[in-house]
Curated annotation (Swiss-Prot):
InterPro entries: Rab-GAP-TBC_dom, Rab-GAP_TBC_sf, TBC20/Gyp8-like. The chain crosses the membrane at residues 238-258, 367-387. The gene is TBC1D20. Its main location: membrane. One of its GO terms (molecular function) is GTPase activator activity. Coiled coil: none annotated. GO terms for cellular component: endoplasmic reticulum membrane; Golgi membrane; nuclear membrane. One of its GO terms (biological process) is positive regulation by host of viral genome replication. Residues 18-27 have a biased composition (Basic and acidic residues). This is TBC1 domain family member 20. GTPase-activating protein (GAP) specific for Rab1 and Rab2 small GTPase families for which it can accelerate the intrinsic GTP hydrolysis rate by more than five orders of magnitude. Also shows GAP activity for RAB18 GTPase. Promotes RAB18 dissociation from the endoplasmic reticulum (ER) membrane into the cytosol, probably through stimulating RAB18 GTP-hydrolysis. Involved in maintaining endoplasmic reticulum structure. It is found in: Membrane. Keywords: GTPase activation, Membrane, Transmembrane, Transmembrane helix.
Length: 403
């Protein structure tokens, strides 16, 4: 059951950052909607263009568009969604009681003012989706916070389509969170401090001295920020971004939040309790579009492959959610980027030109910022690199193309 009657299909990402005049804003929005539908109606579907639209300013704009685009980003066939039979699994599932407790505590994840009967119905559907996915994929292990991701897809897509997308997400982007241990989850968290160190060595050293660790970001990572953000518009905007990008992009976004709060952190007492308390209370008025742009820039500047050695000393440093994608490549026939984009990929993304001036960092000056942080992911070469990386990791179905 999609949530059309409760929230409608208006914009869910709020006004775009930048303070443009209303007329200009509306014109940009109409242009973007037209470009999205042009990509959707291409034969085959222009998934590369859809990824650019999801990353760029404002994201996918409405839940109606998300219902069409999110399945394309995950390469899910919407013509044959799985049957819903989770209710039959409640008595036999070892996870049922924990799932039930978590779902009962999820009241704030539903829109304010939603009729109680409708919310309770959605909570029942949420339980069924989770139990069905776990039953169909016995290698997956439920974790607290998983329901925060599932409910976002349920509210946008409805039960049947949400089941298909979350199942694909669970076996790829979220796979490491669903291991029997937290080892791989902790490894992904280990990317946080190396990213911060590349941009702001003083902030990194302060946090190391405080011994704050990375546990403050655990709920951000494993729920894709769904558990910590109160405005649903911000949550789905981030999901647009994450679904269009490499599976490790959420940890880059976590890093830019910490970097954005640099002065608050440095003004703290340099002890674990003070810094952890500050960082675990995520502000609700973050400049999301700016942070999305910066996260994309940092991913281009410092890709996971370059940070793996710092993230973990052992040779299996790349054993993260990204590793589950290595058997997936999109056939070129499934994509239709135009020649201009191809030329920009070839001409603008030369690592020697993009990185030579910023990889040497002074250890003492916290005001030194990367020039790349000024790039705009929505328009610049960084966006193309992020999309290109996402396409390299994106799922494929043998010879099955999008309808």
């Amino acid at each position: 059951m999609a949530l059309r009657s409760a929230r409608g299909d208006g914009p869910t990402s709020g006004r775009w950052d930048g303070g443009a005049e209303k007329g200009d804003f509306n014109a940009k929005r109409k242009k973007k909607v037209a470009e999205i539908y042009q990509a959707l109606n291409s034969e085959p579907t222009d998934v590369a263009a859809l990824r650019r639209m999801a990353i760029s300013e404002g994201g996918l704009l409405t839940d109606e568009i998300r219902r069409k685009v999110w399945p394309k980003l995950l390469n899910v066939n919407t013509n044959d969604p799985p049957p819903i039979s989770g209710k039959n699994l409640r008595q036999m599932s070892k996870d049922y009681q924990q799932v039930l407790l978590d779902v009962r505590r999820s009241l704030r994840r539903f829109p304010p003012g939603m009729p109680e009967e409708q919310r309770e119905g959605l909570q029942e559907e949420l339980i069924d989706i989770i139990l069905l996915i776990l039953e169909r994929n016995p290698q997956l292990h439920y974790y607290q916070g998983y329901h925060d991701i599932v409910v976002t897809f349920l509210l946008v897509l409805g039960e049947r389509l949400a089941t298909s997308l979350v199942e694909k997400l669970s076996t790829h982007h979220l796979r490491d969170f669903m291991d029997p241990t937290m080892d791989n989850t902790k490894h992904i968290l280990n990317y946080l401090m190396p990213i911060i160190d590349q941009v702001n060595p003083e902030l990194h050293d302060f946090m190391q001295s405080a011994e704050v660790g990375t546990i403050f970001a655990l709920s951000w990572l494993i729920t894709w920020f769904g558990h910590v953000l109160s405005d649903f518009r911000h949550v789905v905007r981030l999901y647009d971004f994450f679904l269009a990008c490499h599976p490790l992009m959420p940890i880059y976004f976590a890093a830019v939040i910490v970097l954005y709060r640099e002065q608050e952190v440095l003004d703290c007492d340099c002890d674990m309790a003070s810094v952890h308390h500050l960082l675990s209370q995520i502000p609700q008025d973050l400049p999301y579009e700016t942070l999305i742009s910066r996260a994309g820039d940092l991913f281009v500047q410092f890709p996971p492959s370059e940070l793996a050695r710092e993230a973990a000393a052992q040779p299996q440093a790349e054993k993260t959610a990204a590793s589950t994608f290595k058997d997936f490549e999109l056939a070129s026939a499934q994509q239709r980027p135009d020649m201009v984009l191809r030329q920009r990929f070839r001409g603008l993304l030369r690592p020697d030109e993009r990185t030579k001036d910023v990889l040497t960092k002074p250890r003492t000056n916290r005001f030194v910022k990367l020039a790349v942080m000024g790039l705009t992911v929505a328009l610049g070469a960084a966006a193309l690199a992020v999309v290109k990386s996402a396409l390299e990791w994106a799922p494929k179905f043998q010879l099955q193309l999008f309808p």
